Curated annotation (Swiss-Prot):
Protein EC: 3.2.2.27
UniProt record similarity statement: Belongs to the uracil-DNA glycosylase (UDG) superfamily. UNG family.
GO cellular component, one term: cytoplasm
Active-site residue list: D67 (proton acceptor)
GO biological process: base-excision repair, AP site formation via deaminated base removal
This protein's UniProt keywords: Cytoplasm, DNA damage, DNA repair, Hydrolase
Superkingdom, taxonomy of origin: Bacteria
Organism: Borrelia duttonii (strain Ly)
InterPro entries, per database record: UDG_fam1, Ura-DNA_Glyclase_AS, Uracil-DNA_glycosylase-like, Uracil-DNA_glycosylase-like_sf
Catalysed reactions, semicolon-separated: Hydrolyzes single-stranded DNA or mismatched double-stranded DNA and polynucleotides, releasing free uracil
Pfam family, one: UDG
Compartment(s) where it occurs, according to its Swiss-Prot or TrEMBL record: Cytoplasm
Protein name: Uracil-DNA glycosylase
Length: 223
């Protein structure tokens, strides 16, 4: 199982990789890919795509998701993102809609958010793998322990990061973040079921750009 992760992340996470729970997690995941072939998403090389695309020190914004898309060919290791040849999912359509409304710009009709990640947006799912057609199928196998630690490491070692917490699941991570040194933005999930309960009209993206400017950070083009 080939896994790619950027060097600075290897250094930040090396102690985590040595822990018993993580070794058990790796063993479970390896077996899933071995026995279920092409039914586990994303492909092994993209499990840590969020970490491989963005060096640790370059993180400016964190957007938290729950687990990867469970349809074939969708997940690419970045939360809310899909491969460029895949139809844009409803939640991401609403994200683009809110960006266009709040920033008065036209988004690119392409669901691959690598362009955001390369500018400093850490698109982190709490659970990094999933079985086809079974959302949350890899819940409680160790991923949440790992990604909670990741959030704590970001909070402790970086300053003035914007955390966008959408929906109750993401809001539950607030206790892991030092609110005295970071900006936390909370609202409903962008899913069609809840986007009208706060997400659409939240101005999270305009607030994010303003905060980055106030702290002398290069802003992000969210097109």
């Amino acid at each position: 199982m080939e896994v790619k992760i950027e060097e600075s992340w290897k250094e930040m996470l090396k102690s985590e990789f040595c822990k018993g729970y993580f070794k058990r997690l790796v063993s479970f995941i390896k077996n899933e890919y071995k026995t279920k072939k092409d039914k586990i998403f994303p492909p092994p090389r993209l499990i840590f795509n969020a970490f491989d695309t963005l060096p640790f020190k370059d993180i400016k914004v964190v957007i938290l998701g729950q687990d990867p898309y469970h349809g074939k060919g969708q997940a690419n290791g970045l939360a809310f993102s899909v491969n460029s040849d895949i139809k844009i999912p409803p939640s991401l359509q609403n994200i683009f809609k809110e960006i266009e409304r709040s920033l008065k710009i036209k988004t690119i009709p392409n669901g691959d958010l690598t362009r955001w990640a390369e500018q400093g947006t850490f698109l982190l799912n709490s659970i990094l793998t999933v079985e086809e057609g079974r959302p949350s199928s890899h819940k409680d196998i160790g991923w949440e322990i790992f990604t909670n630690e990741v959030i704590k490491i970001i909070s402790k070692n970086l300053n003035n990061v914007v955390f966008m917490l959408w929906g109750n699941f993401a809001k539950g991570k607030k206790e892991l973040i030092d609110t005295s040194k970071h900006l936390i933005l909370e609202t409903s999930h962008p899913s069609p079921y809840s986007a009208h309960n706060g997400f659409l009209g939240s101005n999270h993206f305009s607030k994010t750009l303003r905060y980055l400017q106030e702290h002398n950070k290069t802003t992000i083009n969210f097109q």
